[in-house]
A protein has these predicted regions:
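Active-site core segments that coordinate phosphate-bearing ligands/cofactors
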Residues: 1-205
C-alpha cells in the first residue's frame, strides 16, 4: 500500500532503484526511487517510504503545475476557446468532454509556435514555490514580452515554464540519486501527460 504520490510512481512503472517519474496534475513533482531515506534541506526535497517498504521515493514538488494551464484556459485563451467552440462545439458533449476537447485544441494551438516561445519565459509559481527553493511569496511572471509576441506564445511559454521547472528539480535530485543508478527513462504521467505536444516539449527540454 501507499499514498497517492508513491502509487502514481508505481502506476507509471517507476519501481526499481534509480527509476524516475514526473507527474503533472494540479500540482506536480519529480520522484526517484532510492534505497534509503534522504533529505536535501537546501532544495526542500525529501524521501518518503515507498509502496514497497524496502524503498523510498525522493520527491521535489511544484505547487502549481497543470493548474497553470488551467489558469491559461480561464484567462489567456478565451479567444482560442471561442474559436474552438464555434468550430468544434457539440451540444451533446458533456462538460467534462468539452473540457478535454478544449485542452486538446490548445495543444494544437501551441504546436504552431516554435520551441522557445519567441523568447518568452514563464515562471510557474502561481501559489508560491516549494522546490528547489521555498518562497511562499514567489509569483508567476512572463519575461521578454515584446511587440511581436502574441497570446499563443504566452500560452506555449506557460507549458515550457512548467517543463523547465521539472527539469530543474530532476537535475537537483540527480546530485544525490546518481550514486545509485541514473534512470535511462523518465516516465511522465498525470493530466499534463495527455497532450502529445506537452510530452514532446518535456522530452526536448
Amino acid at each position: 500500500g501507499g499514498g497517492d504520490a508513491s502509487l502514481i510512481g508505481v502506476g507509471a512503472g517507476a519501481v526499481e532503484i534509480g527509476d524516475a517519474h514526473i507527474y503533472s496534475g494540479t500540482s506536480g513533482w519529480v520522484g526517484t526511487v532510492v534505497p534509503e531515506q534522504m533529505v536535501d534541506t537546501g532544495a526542500m526535497m525529501a524521501a518518503i517510504v515507498g509502496a514497497n517498504p524496502e524503498t523510498f521515493n525522493y520527491f521535489g514538488e511544484l505547487e502549481t503545475s497543470n493548474k497553470c494551464v488551467g489558469w491559461v484556459k480561464d484567462h489567456l485563451a478565451l479567444d482560442e476557446i471561442g474559436v474552438f467552440l464555434k468550430r468544434y462545439g457539440n451540444a451533446t458533449d458533456s462538460l467534462e468532454q468539452v473540457e478535454f476537447n478544449m485542452y486538446d485544441y490548445l495543444e494544437e494551438v501551441i504546436d504552431t509556435i516554435p520551441a522557445g516561445s519567441n523568447g518568452v519565459i514563464f515562471t510557474p509559481w502561481l501559489h508560491g514555490n516549494r522546490c528547489p527553493f521555498e518562497d511562499p511569496n514567489a509569483a508567476g511572471m512572463f519575461f521578454n514580452i515584446r511587440l511581436n509576441v502574441g497570446k499563443t506564445e504566452l500560452i506555449r511559454a506557460v507549458v515550457e515554464g512548467i517543463c523547465f521547472h521539472m527539469r530543474w528539480m530532476l537535475e537537483r535530485q540527480e546530485l544525490k540519486t546518481t550514486k545509485y543508478q541514473k534512470s535511462k527513462t523518465v516516465r511522465f504521467c498525470g493530466g499534463g501527460a495527455l497532450g502529445e505536444t506537452t510530452c514532446q516539449i518535456l522530452a526536448d527540454i
